[in-house]
Amino acid sequence: MESLGATVKEPGSTRKNKTGSWRTFKPFLDKDKCIDCDNCILFCPEGCIDKEHEIDYDYCKGCGICAEECPVKAIKMEREK
């Protein structure tokens, strides 16, 4: 099997189009429980969580990876209203 290298010159369509409008579940962070491990930032596939642990809901797809990776369960997924 051969390897193929590539460079992404432009972000995918997520940055061009707000995708948060069709989300079913929404992450909520309890900052009192947060231990600043930054797992949520590291594992978010859309890069929707900033250094202050604010979530950009315009682009969050509600996948729940941030909640799954949080070691202290400071992020809860709630049904979108």
UniProtKB/Swiss-Prot annotation:
Cited SUPFAM superfamilies: 4Fe-4S ferredoxins (SSF54862)
pH dependence: Optimum pH is 10.0.
Cofactor note: Binds 2 [4Fe-4S] clusters.
Molecular function as annotated in GO: 4 iron, 4 sulfur cluster binding; metal ion binding; oxidoreductase activity, acting on the aldehyde or oxo group of donors, iron-sulfur protein as acceptor
Temperature dependence of activity: Optimum temperature is 80 degrees Celsius.
Cofactors that this protein relies on: [4Fe-4S] cluster
Residues involved in [4Fe-4S] cluster 2 binding: C44, C60, C63, C66
Binding locations of [4Fe-4S] cluster 1: C34, C37, C40, C70
Cross-referenced Pfam families: Fer4_21
InterPro entries for the chain: 4Fe4S_Fe-S-bd, 4Fe4S_Fe_S_CS, PorD_KorD, Pyruvate_synthase_PorD
Top-level taxon of origin: Archaea
Keywords tagged on the record: 4Fe-4S, Electron transport, Iron, Iron-sulfur, Metal-binding, Repeat, Transport
Disordered: annotated segments: 1-20
Ranges where the 4Fe-4S ferredoxin-type domain occurs: 25-54, 51-80
Subunit structure: Heterotetramer of one alpha, one beta, one delta and one gamma chain.
Name of the protein: Pyruvate synthase subunit PorD
Lineage, uppermost ranks: Archaea, Methanobacteriati, Methanobacteriota, Methanomada group, Methanobacteria
Gene of this entry: porD
